[in-house]
């Protein structure tokens, strides 16, 4: 369970950071 959660977060975080940088 935790392995899948970490892999999902690893994929999600870069996209969230990209969206945050676009807003600025």
Curated annotation (Swiss-Prot):
GO MF annotation, one: toxin activity
Superkingdom of origin: Eukaryota
Transmembrane segments annotated in the record for this chain: none
Gene Ontology CC: extracellular region; membrane; other organism cell membrane
Tissue specificity statement from the Swiss-Prot or TrEMBL entry: Expressed by the venom gland.
Location relative to the cell: Secreted; Target cell membrane
Family matches, as InterPro entries: Antimicrobial_4
Keywords: Antibiotic, Antimicrobial, Cytolysis, Fungicide, Hemolysis, Membrane, Secreted, Target cell membrane, Target membrane, Toxin
Major localization listed first in the record, in broad terms: secreted
One family name in Pfam for this protein: Antimicrobial_4
Gene Ontology BP annotations: defense response to bacterium; defense response to fungus; killing of cells of another organism
Summary of the function given for this chain in its UniProt record: Has a broad spectrum of activity against both Gram-positive and Gram-negative bacteria and S.cerevisiae. Has insecticidal and hemolytic activities. May act by disrupting the integrity of the bacterial cell membrane.
Annotated family: Belongs to the non-disulfide-bridged peptide (NDBP) superfamily. Medium-length antimicrobial peptide (group 3) family. Ponericin-W subfamily.
Name used for this protein in its record: M-poneritoxin-Ng1e
């Amino acid at each position: 369970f935790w392995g899948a959660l970490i892999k999902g977060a690893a994929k999600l975080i870069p996209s969230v950071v990209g969206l945050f940088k676009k807003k600025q």
